[in-house]
């Protein structure tokens, strides 16, 4: 269950994966006046679709907003017993995320949020995780979430006869039932990689998802694409897919924005037929971080010679900005902080390490707000779209 935060100056509690850490669409709606007062023009949400994790980059159902973010109309069942690892016993979670009343009500709340954002002149961008899904996903259902649910087909983990068998690549097609030989993204068995080249049905489904959420009645204004260059098993297919993706999205909503998470040279995807732009790591976040803090963006390394190194800063910016067409550069996501890296303010303390080894309190020790303000001045005046991570304001 979500928690209400009463003291925003207090350091968050130590991470608890079973305790969805607060925040939902109703909360965003309640803060619309505040967001409008700040001058916010676009709300970019991390994944909102059904998922058992807090981060939700392991999608369980692409067709519905997670009821923990949306609306729980009907509740039931019990939380999973402490120290239990059998997800079949997660009856409370299963009841919430398979109940169609909860799912439909959550989608309706998202519609309301987008309508309110549009009324105030704001736009809404969704996070699309299409390279992989989660092991909880209804297509795989390794965790047996949908075993007893109505109107759901058997998952590919359980049987070769599943209608979703082709959605995944199994190294051993004779290892059913409960086939553990499916391909996981970077070897993670909780993140089954989607098998587009061998499944026209999967490709059609995801393209329909892309179209659905930027069309009435949902009317989102674009997509941010997670690990977009990893999708598929070849560069040839990757480019082909994103061309198809662009066609269906732009046909449904010509004004929709398509941004990709990408590290390295994005030129091949920014030819006007795939992505509009990218999260600007190479030509903004990284050089800004090295120049103003001397820190690597995860806080994993400090290099004294990079701090204040104007020559390196200028050369890096010039080199990587040359990879962009002007139109792509002007809408590139210029971030100082985001969900994948330490906060910029934390980097100003020059402490090397993460919460796991330093403790959460270290993130706020010895920080320099003056450096943060310098960074924001540059961010707000640099070519591109200044993008604030929730809380940095």
Residue ranges and their predicted role:
Residues 64-76, 144, 230-232, 289-296, ...:
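Short regulatory "switch" loops immediately downstream of catalytic or recognition motifs
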């Amino acid at each position: 269950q979500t928690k209400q935060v009463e003291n925003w100056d207090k350091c968050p509690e130590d991470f608890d994966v079973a305790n969805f850490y607060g925040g939902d669409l109703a909360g965003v709606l309640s803060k619309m006046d505040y967001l409008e007062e700040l001058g916010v023009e676009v709300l970019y949400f991390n994944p909102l679709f059904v998922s058992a994790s807090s981060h939700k980059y392991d999608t369980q159902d692409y067709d519905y907003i997670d009821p923990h973010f949306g609306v729980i109309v009907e509740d039931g069942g019990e939380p999973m017993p402490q120290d239990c690892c059998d997800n079949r016993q997660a009856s409370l979670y299963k009841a919430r995320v398979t109940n169609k009343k909860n799912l439909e009500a959550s989608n309706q709340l998202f519609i309301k949020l987008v309508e309110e954002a549009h009324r105030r002149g704001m736009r809404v961008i969704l996070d699309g995780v299409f390279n992989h899904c989660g092991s909880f996903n209804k297509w795989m259902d390794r965790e047996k979430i949908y075993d007893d649910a109505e109107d759901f087909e058997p998952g590919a983990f359980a049987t070769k006869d599943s209608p979703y068998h082709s959605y995944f690549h199994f190294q051993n097609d004779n290892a059913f039932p409960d086939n553990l030989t499916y391909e996981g993204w970077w070897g993670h068995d909780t993140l089954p990689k989607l098998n587009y080249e061998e499944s026209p049905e999967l490709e059609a489904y995801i393209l329909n998802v892309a179209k659905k959420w930027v069309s009435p009645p949902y009317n989102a204004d674009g997509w941010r694409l997670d690990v977009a260059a990893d999708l598929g098993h070849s560069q040839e297919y990757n480019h082909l897919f994103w061309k198809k993706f662009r066609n269906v999205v732009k046909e449904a909503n010509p004004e929709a924005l398509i941004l990709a998470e990408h590290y390295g040279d994005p030129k091949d995807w920014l030819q006007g037929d795939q992505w509009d732009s990218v999260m600007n790591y190479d030509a903004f976040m990284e050089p800004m971080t090295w120049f103003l803090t001397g820190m690597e963006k995860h806080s994993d390394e400090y290099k004294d010679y990079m701090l204040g190194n104007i020559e390196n800063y200028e050369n890096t910016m010039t080199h990587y900005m040359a990879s962009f067409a002007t139109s792509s550069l002007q809408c590139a996501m210029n971030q100082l902080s985001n969900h994948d890296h330490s906060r910029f303010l934390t980097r100003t303390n020059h402490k090397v390490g993460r919460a796991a080894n330093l403790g959460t309190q270290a993130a706020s020790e010895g920080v320099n707000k003056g450096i943060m303000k310098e960074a924001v001045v540059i961010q707000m005046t640099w070519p591109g779209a200044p993008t604030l991570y929730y809380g940095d304001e």
